[in-house]
């Protein structure tokens, strides 16, 4: 058995920044540091930060007064921001800047009196935060659609004053079909100048397609609640390549590799490389050889830290 590695894979710039914000806050201010929602959707990362003194909560009413709170990479609604400000909580915002871009678009549509359609998955924290940027007090509305069926059933108030945005971690192929359905049903609909699906999601989906084309089975390292990791598994499966989503080496089953010659490995944007290395080691212990990276797109994007943490960390 030969191992092939997708390129790129694993951490993106937004995840790197979010984890570093929690780490630096712990270094500068000391524990406990409260984090609203898992800062990124990866069990290993969250457990490591928890062991260092981060406390993860789902709502601000679980946070005591006079503590530091970090908003996760997925972003929060305006209501959550107002609640934190009203309580005087000290907040560091780890929202991915590419998610913030979508938030700004939604807020602009709201101010302009345009209804907004969000393409995304119900219940995902990014979707909840994005929908919470729309102020419906002026009579507008924001709608959530997941697929073409939702588009066909959607009733809007004014199809001439309509715009769409998307969750950043969706399948590019699925989203393209939904956008086509929206443009067919609502010809006047507006949208972002550039696709809202982030560069890291696009790059990892392109890479897993190449991997699935060259391998007999694909392993996606990522947690079950990671949207982008699930999309990678789905993409490989659509190419008729068996694919498994695993948190790490402990989830591997030897029977998956019966009769397999080429094993492909990728990782979601919130999965650290140490987990990939653990998977490689286990496969090599079972007789697999090599760990060759496929040619891929180089990523050199970085996002700046909040000023206070950046300055303090240099003292």
UniProtKB/Swiss-Prot annotation:
Query: Per its UniProt record, what InterPro entries does this chain match?
Result: LytB/IspH
Which Enzyme Commission number(s) are listed? 1.17.7.4
Which residues take part in binding dimethylallyl diphosphate? Answer: 41, 74, 124, 226-228, 270
An example of a GO molecular function for this protein is: metal ion binding
The UniProt entry's GO biological process terms, in alphabetical order, are: dimethylallyl diphosphate biosynthetic process; isopentenyl diphosphate biosynthetic process, methylerythritol 4-phosphate pathway; terpenoid biosynthetic process
**Origin: domain of life:** Bacteria
Instruction: Give cofactor(s), names only.
Output: [4Fe-4S] cluster
Looking up Gene3D superfamilies in the UniProt record yields:
3.40.50.11270, 4-hydroxy-3-methylbut-2-enyl diphosphate reductase, catalytic domain
Active site residues of this protein: 126
| Cofactor: binding comment | Binds 1 [4Fe-4S] cluster per subunit.
- Residues annotated to bind [4Fe-4S] cluster: 12, 96, 198
Q: Where does (2E)-4-hydroxy-3-methylbut-2-enyl diphosphate bind?
A: 41, 74, 124, 168, 226-228, 270
PANTHER family documented for this protein: 4-HYDROXY-3-METHYLBUT-2-ENYL DIPHOSPHATE REDUCTASE (PTHR30426:SF0)
Tell me the protein family, please.
Answer: Belongs to the IspH family.
> What's its job?
Catalyzes the conversion of 1-hydroxy-2-methyl-2-(E)-butenyl 4-diphosphate (HMBPP) into a mixture of isopentenyl diphosphate (IPP) and dimethylallyl diphosphate (DMAPP). Acts in the terminal step of the DOXP/MEP pathway for isoprenoid precursor biosynthesis.
Protein name per Swiss-Prot or TrEMBL: 4-hydroxy-3-methylbut-2-enyl diphosphate reductase
Q: What is the native source organism of this protein?
A: Pseudomonas fluorescens (strain ATCC BAA-477 / NRRL B-23932 / Pf-5)
């Amino acid at each position: 058995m030969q191992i092939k590695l997708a390129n790129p894979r694993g951490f993106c710039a937004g995840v790197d920044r979010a984890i570093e914000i929690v780490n630096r806050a712990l270094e500068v201010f000391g524990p406990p540091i409260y984090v609203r929602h898992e800062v990124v959707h990866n069990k290993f990362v969250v457990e490591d930060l928890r062991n260092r003194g981060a406390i993860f909560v789902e709502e601000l009413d679980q946070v005591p007064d006079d503590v530091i709170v970090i908003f996760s990479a997925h972003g929060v609604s305006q209501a959550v921001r107002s609640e934190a400000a009203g309580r005087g909580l000290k907040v560091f915002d780890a929202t991915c800047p590419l998610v913030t871009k979508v938030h700004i678009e939604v807020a602009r549509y709201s101010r302009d009196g345009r209804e907004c359609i969000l393409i995304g998955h119900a219940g995902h924290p990014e979707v909840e935060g994005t929908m919470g940027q729309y102020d419906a007090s002026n009579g507008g509305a924001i709608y959530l659609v997941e697929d073409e069926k939702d588009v066909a059933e959607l009733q809007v108030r004014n199809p001439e004053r309509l715009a769409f945005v998307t969750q950043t971690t969706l399948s590019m192929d699925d989203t393209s079909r939904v956008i086509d359905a929206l443009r067919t049903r609502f010809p006047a609909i507006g949208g972002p100048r550039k696709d809202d699906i982030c560069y890291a999601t696009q790059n990892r989906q392109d890479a897993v397609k190449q991997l699935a084309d060259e391998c007999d089975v694909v392993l996606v390292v990522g947690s079950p609640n990671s949207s982008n990791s699930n999309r990678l598994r789905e993409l490989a499966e659509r190419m008729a390549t068996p694919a498994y989503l695993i948190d790490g080496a402990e989830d591997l089953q030897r029977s998956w590799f019966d009769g397999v010659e080429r094993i492909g490995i990728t990782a979601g944007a919130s999965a650290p490389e140490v987990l990939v290395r653990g998977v490689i080691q286990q496969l090599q212990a079972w007789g697999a050889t090599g760990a060759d990276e496929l040619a891929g797109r180089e990523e050199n994007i970085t996002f700046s830290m909040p000023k206070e943490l950046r300055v303090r960390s240099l003292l």
